[in-house]
Amino acid sequence: MKIKDLIKNKALPSFCTANFDVIESIFYYCNINKLPCLIECTSNQVNQDGGYTSNTPKLFVNKINNLRKKIKLKQSQLFLGGDHLGPLPWKNNTNKIALKKSVKLINSFLNEKFDKIHVDTSIKCKNDKSINNEIIFDRTCKILSSTIIKKKINDKFLVIGTEVPLSGSNDDKKVIITSIKKIKIEALNFKNFLESLHLKKKNFWFSH
C-alpha cells in the first residue's frame, strides 16, 4: 500500500529521527506487530553535506536497509521520508545559494527513493529582511519546477508547508500552545491565500 492509502485506511505514525538506536527499537516493534513503519529524517540531520549526523541520503538509506535486513522487517513495511527539505541547513547563505542547494538536497532524496517529501521554504535566509506566504510559495514553485525535480516528484507523497514553531527551534524560545480557534483562523487564511495564488499562477498548478 502507498502512504496515502495507509493514512486513509487507518493512520500512519511518522518517526522523525536519525538515531539508529531509536530506529532499531521501532523496527523491532513494527516487525513483531506486523505494522507499517515511516521513518523520517530532517534536512539538518541528513543532507548532501552530511548534516549533523554525517549522513548523506545515500548513506542513511544504506544503513536503514542493513538494519531492516538484520531485524527481518519486510521492505513493503518500510517507508522513508525527508522532513523540512529546503533552505534550513543553509539559512546563513543568501536565498539564491540556499535555494540552489535545496534543489540538490531534494534531488538527492528522490534519487534514493524516499517515499514522502516535505518541502519547507519558510526559513529566512541571510539576505531576507522578512518572509511571507508569497515568498514561500514562489520558492516552493521554483524548487518543484526545477527540471531534475519535476520528473521525479509526481509519484511521491508530497507535503508542502511548515509548522509552529519553525523547524530548527522557536526564535523567541517561548513555548506557546496554539488554540483551536487560532488554528481554524490560520487554516482559513491559508486556504484563501492558496485560492488567490491558484488564480494568479495557473501554469504551475496545472503542470503538477
Across the structure, where does each feature detected by a protein language model lie?
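Hydrophobic faces of well-ordered beta-strands that scaffold small-molecule active sites
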Residues: 11-17, 37-41, 76-84, 115-121, ...
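Acidic, His- and aromatic-enriched active-site or binding-groove loops in soluble protein domains
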Residues: 136-147, 178-194
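Membrane-embedded hairpin module used as a gating/binding unit in multi-pass transport
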Residues: 163, 189-208
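Active-site-proximal beta-alpha loop/turn segments in soluble metabolic enzymes
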Residues: 45-49, 84-92, 121-134, 157-181, ...
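Alpha/beta catalytic barrel-like cores
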Residues: 1-72, 76-77, 89
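Glycine-rich anion/phosphate-binding loops
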Residues: 17-22, 51-63, 90-108, 135-143
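Alpha-helix-loop-beta-strand connector modules within alpha/beta enzyme cores
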Residues: 54-82, 132-156
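Active-site mouth loops of central-metabolism enzymes
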Residues: 9-21, 81-103, 173-181
